[in-house]
């Protein structure tokens, strides 16, 4: 993997900087590194493809070295370099696609394609290493079963979940009370509602709670908390739990009371925030507990009082909500996030070349299913294919 990254970094630098008119002295270090790569690769043969519809291709390396000059690089010099660079880039592209198409239940962190296994041989260690990539650094740590750390922005840590629970259910009488939520990606939105606006609740207060367990623990997370759940702020028709009927939801938004956010790790509370909105941090957690209250307003103007009558029918439904959004965090496991296209790159290659469903990844690389059942085998394979995708993205956009 280190060799694959180093070759790609060398090719990227050469493609960007070996251009007509450039002084040789300005790119001599790159050319020297480029020539070392050629010397190491010459005389070797590789084969890629042969999975799904990815075609089998054979690769042979026999290229001349780039020479020295005291002057600027001319068109002939650059053309010779370009021919070599384009062949190498095509080779790296196919090695990466071959690797992204493969998976293994055992030791999925290790190279799976014949070409990348061969590149892992001792003879290729002479290629100048450049291990500045976060993915390469973490791949090396994971390969040695040491602790890794990925920095994510808006990590896709929550499997998609959209549902509701009813604590009071009288749909025929238009009198419901409960919680509805939408968890997806890096965001939780949860709303508590009471059609009667806590009319007969103790002290005219309804208590709501929403607990979310993460599939992987996060550390040093920056989180935004808002006293609203905008996705539940407009009327809708909702199917009953048994699918036998539907019920109408017509929310009127109130501000939640006694909001408390708890972050837990292995059942122990690590951080607690009460009535705190905006930006907060959480040190280390694998569970989030949100609790909040709906309080019937003790004093109401006639207009508000008309919204929340003392008896049925309840045409407007008191609703309070919270939004929790993970803006950034560190995780020991690789995840998809909003700043990267690794999941999309891997999925696109597997779809384009009709890669058959294997023993590890779900059909279509369905992220909700993948993260819901995030096994060690999936973690190893995902880290490997994401690392390869990050290498490929240096050369292929």
UniProtKB/Swiss-Prot annotation:
Compartments where found: Virion
Sequence positions that bind Zn(2+): 153
Interaction with the inner capsid protein VP2: annotated segments: 62-73
Keyword Methyltransferase among UniProt keywords: no
UniProt binding sites for Ca(2+): 266, 286
Pfam families: Rota_Capsid_VP6
Record's function text: Intermediate capsid protein that self assembles to form an icosahedral capsid with a T=13 symmetry, which consists of 230 trimers of VP6, with channels at each of its five-fold vertices. This capsid constitutes the middle concentric layer of the viral mature particle. The innermost VP2 capsid and the intermediate VP6 capsid remain intact following cell entry to protect the dsRNA from degradation and to prevent unfavorable antiviral responses in the host cell during all the replication cycle of the virus.
Subunit text: Homotrimer. Interacts with the inner capsid protein VP2. Interacts with the outer capsid glycoprotein VP7. Interacts with the outer capsid protein VP5*.
Note: The VP6 trimer contains a zinc ion located at the center of the molecule. The zinc ion is not essential for either trimerization or transcription activity of the DLP. Zinc-depleted VP6 has an increased sensitivity to proteases.
Family label: Belongs to the rotavirus VP6 family.
Protein name (Swiss-Prot/TrEMBL): Intermediate capsid protein VP6
Natural source organism: Rotavirus A (isolate RVA/Equine/United Kingdom/L338/1988/G13P12[18]) (RV-A)
